[in-house]
């Protein structure tokens, strides 16, 4: 009789254990996938990276006296060949200037390792206006087989100055058409956007960038989304070195709203502290995340799909 009771008790424990495991498995499966968030985040910081690189391409004053004739991936450029100051984007990153046609071409000859640990390959072609730093002046950026951290970047980006304050600080309208990011696993996301950037300077040095605007597109899982910045997203020079990371420049504050169908997600980048922390809120539940660590195709711990 005692043996029978013992067997029954053990059987009950096993049943409860299986039930608990199944329940935990169901809860894990229902946890919200991080892919949409990470793709939106990468798109945002990669744009900042491209903009900074383009600014640096225009900031280089010294170049070799030799005229180069370079051809990479079907794109050729003839003109003075320059290097980025301090090999910031790797020793194999060079700039050629076609002053007659107002074109700068940035070549990454092989896999170039930058100061932040980022890798780049391919070509960036920058067309620019005759005027610089004035209302109406512009830069247009296109890519040829360009990869940043093994993610292929495509699309046409246009930056146009629409306002100047005190002769220094600028308001820039940025648009993206046919934007596409292809990930190492072959999946891709698409997007278009229109944003406004207010850039504050001290002398010729950028102190901060405040970003507003919206975007829309399709994630790699095939779901359409809309993004709106509801509180300006801020990047600062003060935190730039502390927040250096291979994913790109990390914002210190600002809020954006992402809507997929009937699902809404709020991302809060903080209140100005120099950290990698952000808060993601869905259905009234908030999860704190580390922007250095989060990756695509993982699960949030608290947020449910």
Outline where the language-model segments fall.
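Bacterial Sec-dependent N-terminal signal peptides
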Residues: 1-30
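Low-complexity, intrinsically disordered segments exposed to solvent
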Residues: 23-305
């Amino acid at each position: 009789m005692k043996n029978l009771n013992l067997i029954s008790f053990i059987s009950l424990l096993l049943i409860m254990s299986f039930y608990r495991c199944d329940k935990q498995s169901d809860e894990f499966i229902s946890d919200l996938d991080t892919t949409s968030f990470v793709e939106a985040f990468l798109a945002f910081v990669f744009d900042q990276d491209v903009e900074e690189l383009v600014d640096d391409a225009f900031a280089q004053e010294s170049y070799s006296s030799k005229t180069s004739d370079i051809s990479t991936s079907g794109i050729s450029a003839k003109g003075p060949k320059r290097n980025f100051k301090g090999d910031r984007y790797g020793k194999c990153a060079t700039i050629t200037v076609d002053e007659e046609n107002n074109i700068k071409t940035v070549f990454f000859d092989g896999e170039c390792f930058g100061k932040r640990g980022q890798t780049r390959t391919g070509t960036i072609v920058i067309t620019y206006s005759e005027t610089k730093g004035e209302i109406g002046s512009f830069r247009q950026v296109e890519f040829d087989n360009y990869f940043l951290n093994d993610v292929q970047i495509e699309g046409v980006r246009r930056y146009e100055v629409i306002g100047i304050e005190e002769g220094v600080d600028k308001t820039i309208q940025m648009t993206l058409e046919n934007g596409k990011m292809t990930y190492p696993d072959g999946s891709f996301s698409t997007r278009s956007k229109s944003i406004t950037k207010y850039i504050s300077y001290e002398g010729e040095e950028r102190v901060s960038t405040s970003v507003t605007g919206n975007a829309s597109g399709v994630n790699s899982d095939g779901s359409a989304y809309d993004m709106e910045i509801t509180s300006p997203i801020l990047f600062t020079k003060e935190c730039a070195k502390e927040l250096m990371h291979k994913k790109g420049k990390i914002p210190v504050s600002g809020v954006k709203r992402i809507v997929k169908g009937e699902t809404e997600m709020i991302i809060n980048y903080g209140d100005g502290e120099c950290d990698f922390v952000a808060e993601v809120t869905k259905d009234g539940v908030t999860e704190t995340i580390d922007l250095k660590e989060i990756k695509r195709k993982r699960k949030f711990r608290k947020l449910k799909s």
